[in-house]
Amino acid sequence: MREQNYGRIVFTSSSSGLYGNFGQSNYGAAKMAMLGLMNTLHLEGAKNNIRVNCLAPTAGTAMTEGLLPEPVFKLLSPEAVSPAVVFLAGLDAPSRKVLGAGGGSFAVFKGFETVGVNLLPDNVSPEGIAAAWDNINDPAGMQEFTGGFEQTGKFAKQGAEKLGLDLS
């Protein structure tokens, strides 16, 4: 793919990885790992026009047969998911997206991080976290990062501001 300066990779994730599903801890962990692999390969392949995505299908399959009522099983046909794979593997595919697909519905899953709170210098403790929990968990101003170092930079900036440090 690097040599031809073009490539498309589509991993299969799952709502069991994105949101959890009772009794599927091993399956959910493996499917969530696809997001980490996608994120890293996206960063490594972007300069070579390699686009990497995940599909999170919801379909009536051998794994879900007997778990879903028959009308739902029929509605969630694998054929209703197939166009998503073709799109994600196409010439104009996006990159670093998790596309959910099922029953003719399509949606993008996004992972966001709250602004958070810095507890330096005196409140870095379980009790400090508990006392600040409402602010730590506040969804206002959530951010979507494009790389792990963006979170590192955010945390360093918050700590420096709290302590009055200049990081430049």
Language-model features: locations:
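C-terminal helical subdomain
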Residues: V72-L165
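Catalytic tyrosine of NAD(P)H-dependent dehydrogenase/reductases that use a Tyr as the general acid/base
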Residues: Y27
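Active-site helix of classical SDR
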Residues: A30
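Active-site "substrate specificity/gating" loop of NAD(P)-dependent dehydrogenases
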Residues: G20-Q24, T64
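Hydrophobic structural elements of the Rossmann-like NAD(P)H-binding subdomain
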Residues: V10, V52-L55, R96, A101
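Residue(s) in the substrate-gating loop at a strand-loop-helix junction
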Residues: S14
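Active-site-adjacent segment of SDR/Rossmann-fold oxidoreductases
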Residues: M1, Y19, L35, T40-I50, ...
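A glycine/serine/threonine-rich, flexible loop-to-helix segment
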Residues: L43, K47, C54-L75, F109-L119
